[in-house]
Curated annotation (Swiss-Prot):
Residues at the catalytic site: H53, N126
Subcellular localization(s) per the UniProt record: Peroxisome matrix
Described purpose of this protein according to its UniProt entry: Catalyzes the degradation of hydrogen peroxide (H(2)O(2)) generated by peroxisomal oxidases to water and oxygen, thereby protecting cells from the toxic effects of hydrogen peroxide.
Signal peptide: none
Catalytic activity annotation: 2 H2O2 = O2 + 2 H2O
Pfam families: Catalase, Catalase-rel
One of the record's GO cellular component terms: mitochondrial matrix
Cofactors, names only: heme
Biological-process GO terms, alphabetical: hydrogen peroxide catabolic process; response to hydrogen peroxide
Designated name of the protein: Peroxisomal catalase
Organism: Candida tropicalis
EC nos: 1.11.1.6
Subunit structure: Homotetramer.
InterPro entries: Catalase, Catalase_AS, Catalase_clade1/3, Catalase_core, Catalase_haem_BS, Catalase_immune_responsive, Catalase_sf
Length: 485
């Protein structure tokens, strides 16, 4: 039986396109609620887009534990090999707006919500293992340089490179970005990385520093700069189309999940800080350990309801998983939930895609607010009332905690020559793959050729610190693309 067409209060509407007016040619009547209702709702269809990661695609799936890591983490969804947990993953570009191209040279967001028996766990990752900053106060400044010039409203190569070359801790991520890894062939064919260091603990009270890797079972495939640019013009929704059509056809993408771990003692001996988001952990010294696999096997039924309204936050954790003292991660614990309250409202966790699978959110003092639609805990007192017993569930705590000593002090994590070491190692690794060093130099030169000459000179100097050969290649092509008088 077909549904009956109604207005917003459920009244049946016999003719949706008829309007009330005076005679055949007179003015419209304000009493025509069907028209006013329709226009008023249309005027409010759009909500604020994400300030970063605005353009995205999503799908549901399942995570399965493949290997026992209970010696590292006692989270319940990991307690049994073969145990399955429903998930929702959202992929995205970072800097572009909602209508931007999927193939832009940009990091890709890789956020996954695990609907566990102990609440929702959000793993809010990227497709690169490092990032541009390690000082959180730099984030708004950095993002502004990757977006539009406030005067011209155009992307601006001078802004882009001025920031990066004066904040040299960015160089490792910039090397990744301007390699062909910066233009993935699809969301299916890229990895995901925690980037940040987290703390996981077991039932013995022991804790570990952890890095997480999602390795694509489809392999890594990339686009050249020219292929990405061509697709941006011919099919800007290329990655969305690829993901949706493959899942619809039963070609379900999957990722195998690994961790790297460090003890506190190992972290103290490491040649870099485990809280430095611009560094990777060498696999030879801190080996990968498999723990699971997830598969995306279900497309959303409604993009706005399930993808646009999906809300992830690294503050959404479960027992035995917690953030480290990484300062950028610490700042994200606040900013992600804050932007969701701005975009979606204070009750954003009541939106179905964001609801815990248990449905058991019980916090008597968190009540009311715009769009509270879950019953608002009925007549239960809006505080912890002594005559209304509440269970406070206990779980094992870490016996050995981190200890911090010191006065409150301003700290700026300034760049040093050591920040070029891993970038130089990456440059040497690229030599093992055909044309990858040349592609990196070409991609940088094409982008930087749009900048003014003084900025170009800084770009050349920046990459020369990585390796003289890289600086020479970039200089040669920049001068060919933008000859100087």
């Amino acid at each position: 039986m077909a549904p009956t067409f109604t207005n917003s209060n459920g009244q049946p509407i016999p003719e949706p396109f008829a309007t009330q007016r005076v005679g055949q040619h007179g003015p419209l009547l304000l009493q025509d609620f069907n028209l006013i209702d329709s226009l008023a709702h249309f005027d409010r269809e759009r909500i604020p887009e994400r300030v970063v990661h605005a353009k995205g695609s999503g799908a549901y799936g399942v995570f399965e534990v493949t290997d026992d890591i209970t010696d590292v983490c006692a989270a319940k969804f990991l307690d049994t090999v073969g145990k399955k947990t429903r998930i929702f993953t959202r992929f995205s570009t970072v800097g572009g707006e909602l209508g931007s191209a999927d193939t832009a040279r940009d990091p890709r967001g890789f956020a996954t919500k695990f609907y566990t028996e102990e609440g929702n766990l959000d793993l809010v990752y990227n497709n690169t293992p490092v990032f541009f900053i390690r000082d959180p106060s730099k984030f708004p400044h950095f993002i502004h340089t990757q977006k539009r010039n406030p005067e011209t409203h155009l992307k601006d190569a001078n802004m882009f490179w001025d920031y990066l070359t004066t904040n040299e801790e960015s160089v490792h991520q910039v090397m990744v970005l301007f390699s062909d890894r910066g233009t993935p062939a699809s969301y299916r064919e890229m990895n995901g990385y925690s980037g940040h260091t987290y703390k996981w603990s077991n039932n013995k009270g022991e804790w570990f520093y952890v890095q997480v890797h999602f390795i694509s079972d489809q392999g890594i495939k990339t686009l050249t700069n020219e292929e990405a640019g061509s697709l941006a013009g011919s099919n800007p929704d290329y990655a969305q189309e690829d993901l949706f059509k493959n899942i619809a056809a039963g070609n379900y993408p999957s990722w195998t999940c690994y961790i790297q771990t460090m003890t506190e003692a190992q972290a103290k001996e490491a040649e870099f800080s485990v809280f430095d988001l611009t560094k990777v952990w060498p696999h030879g010294k801190y080996p990968m350990r498999r723990f699971g696999k997830f598969t995306l096997n279900e497309n959303p039924k409604n993009y706005f309801a399930e993808v646009e309204q999906a809300a992830f936050s690294p503050a959404h954790t479960v027992p035995h998983m917690e953030p480290s003292a990484d300062p950028v991660l610490q700042s994200r614990l606040f900013s992600y939930a804050d932007t969701h309250r701005h975009r979606l409202g204070t009750n954003y966790t009541q939106i179905p895609v964001n609801c815990p699978v248990t449905g058991a959110v019980f916090n008597p003092h968190m009540r009311d607010g715009a769009m509270n639609v879950n019953g608002n805990l009925g007549n239960h007192p809006n505080y912890l009332a002594s005559d209304k017993p509440i269970e406070f569930k206990q779980f094992s705590l870490q016996e050995d905690q981190e200890v911090w000593h010191g006065a409150a002090t301003p700290f700026h994590w300034k760049a040093t020559p050591a920040d070029f070491k891993q970038a130089t190692e990456l440059w040497k690794v690229l030599k093992k793959y055909p044309n990858q060093q040349e592609h990196l130099a070409h991609n940088v030169a094409v982008h930087a050729s749009a900048a003014d000459a003084p900025i170009q000179d800084r770009v050349i100097a920046y990459f020369t610190k990585v390796h003289p050969d890289l600086g020479d290649l970039i200089k040669k092509e920049i001068l060919e693309l933008s000859p100087r008088k």
